[in-house]
Structure formats: structure tokens, C-alpha cells
Amino acid sequence: MVALRLIPCLDVANGRVVKGVNFVNLRDSGDPVELACRYSEAGADELVFLDIRASVENRKTLVDLVSRTAKSVKIPFTVGGGINSIVTINDLLRAGADKVSLNSSAVKNPKIISQSSKKFGTQCIVIAIDARKKHNVSNEWEVYVKGGRENTGLDVVNWAKKVEELGAGEILLTSMDGDGTQNGYDLLLTKTVAKAVNIPVIASGGAGSLEDIFDVFTEGEASAALLASLLHDKKLTIEEIKSFLINKKLIIRPNEK
């Protein structure tokens, strides 16, 4: 069985790591490369960088950040935000990213998923899905784009199945209702999508405790857990999380001594 993964997420705006609640009220959380190094050394399995301003302001993700990170960390990392062309994907992968995350551009032009997966391999293509509960419906979610500002009307589960068909290697699934709240992952959302597809689902949005992370693996059936404010606020460390999960008999890659 493949080991479950812990993945710190670094939301980047104007060259700094930021974190907010429900995608707003952003606060500064530090330098991206410094934090990447810290989490890599602490035992993170992978990292995710999301340039949360790029899609909104139509700016490309900084290749420079990727290049500096690639020189500083040894674990795989994904970069996303404003990536809307094969040329940009190529530039980021050549700069040192292991994977790219597509969101708004994939909804606007689904062909970019199949084109990029054929050119670079499915293992390089992550599709980020920002999901919000449909009004007054507990078990249906809609896809949002433009940093969570625009409702596409697309059903999350149907879109997840579609991106898998087109060649996505992984889904980064964010509960916008839970983002930054530390109130727990949306287990129903995560499990529903994980059961609907055969590719790994990374759960994002709401981690606030050791139990939340355990639950998203066991009840939510996620392949990986994205962690942000929980780590940035130093509420827990990766080592503490891994020790807890290993003691709970989950298959986790232990920290190298």
C-alpha cells in the first residue's frame, strides 16, 4: 500500500506566504523558500505552492520562486496559480517543479489537461478543484474558479470524473467552506470525490487537529492531507502529526533520522 502523504501548502501573494479564512483576510506567514526548507527538513512528504494572486491579476506564477525552491529542497513540490499554457507548464517544470496545478485554466479550456498530460506525463498534472456546498444542499458541491470568486455552476463530482478522463494524475480538492477555519476537513466531500475517481485525492481546507488529519485519511479516504494554517501558526509540527498517525497504525513515511 502506498504511504499516505502530508503536504504543507504555501499560498503565495506578492512573493510572500499568506493565509486567510475562507480565501479572504490574508495575513503574512513568511518567506516561501525559507518555509519550504523548514517543512522539508521537518519531514514533509511534498510541498504545494499556490500563487493565489496570479489567476485574479492574470500574472504568471514566478519561475524564479520555483528555481530557488528547487535548489533548496529535496522533496517533490507542486506549483499552481495562473498557469494557462503549455509553455508556462514547460517553463515551471524546467525550473524545477515536479508537478503543476491547474484550476481556472482547466475549467476554461479542458483540452489543456489532455495536452499537458500527453506532453509531460499524467504524474505532472494536478487539477485543483475549489468546492463549495450548493446552497441548502448537504451532499452537492459546485466548482469555483478565480481564487474562489467565481461560481462555474459545474458539479464537483462530475468535474472530478472528467479531469481524470482527460489525463489528470491527481486532484487537489479544497473545501472553500472549511478553508483556514481549522474546524476539520469536509469528510463527506472528500470521500464522495475519492470514491468517484481512481486517482489520488489530496484533501484541503479545515485541518485543525491531529484527529482531523486521522479522520480525513480513514473516513475521508484521502491519499494525502494538505496542511496550511495549522503548521504556519505552529499549532502542530509535521513530526507530531506523523508520530500520531503511525501510532494509529496508518501507513506513513517516517521521518529520516
From Swiss-Prot:
Catalytic activity, reaction form: 5-[(5-phospho-1-deoxy-D-ribulos-1-ylimino)methylamino]-1-(5-phospho-beta-D-ribosyl)imidazole-4-carboxamide + L-glutamine = D-erythro-1-(imidazol-4-yl)glycerol 3-phosphate + 5-amino-1-(5-phospho-beta-D-ribosyl)imidazole-4-carboxamide + L-glutamate + H(+)
HAMAP family: HisF
Pathway: Amino-acid biosynthesis; L-histidine biosynthesis; L-histidine from 5-phospho-alpha-D-ribose 1-diphosphate: step 5/9
Name used for this protein in its record: Imidazole glycerol phosphate synthase subunit HisF
Subcellular location: Cytoplasm
Record's subunit section: Heterodimer of HisH and HisF.
Active site per the UniProt annotation: D11, D130
GO terms for cellular component: cytoplasm
Tree of life domain: Bacteria
GO biological process, one term: L-histidine biosynthetic process
UniProt-recorded Gene Ontology molecular function terms: imidazoleglycerol-phosphate synthase activity; lyase activity
Main EC class the enzyme belongs to: lyase
Matches recorded under PANTHER family: IMIDAZOLE GLYCEROL PHOSPHATE SYNTHASE HISHF, IMIDAZOLE GLYCEROL PHOSPHATE SYNTHASE SUBUNIT HISF/H IGP SYNTHASE SUBUNIT HISF/H
Family annotation (InterPro entries): Aldolase_TIM (IPR013785), His_biosynth (IPR006062), HisF (IPR004651), IGPS_HisA/HisF (IPR050064), RibuloseP-bd_barrel (IPR011060)
Function (record text): IGPS catalyzes the conversion of PRFAR and glutamine to IGP, AICAR and glutamate. The HisF subunit catalyzes the cyclization activity that produces IGP and AICAR from PRFAR using the ammonia provided by the HisH subunit.
Gene that this polypeptide is encoded by: hisF
UniProt cross-references to CDD domains, sorted A to Z: HisF (cd04731)
Family as reported in the entry's similarity comment: Belongs to the HisA/HisF family.
Enzyme Commission number: 4.3.2.10
Key words, A-Z: Amino-acid biosynthesis, Cytoplasm, Histidine biosynthesis, Lyase
Pfam families given in the database record: His_biosynth
SUPFAM superfamilies: Ribulose-phoshate binding barrel
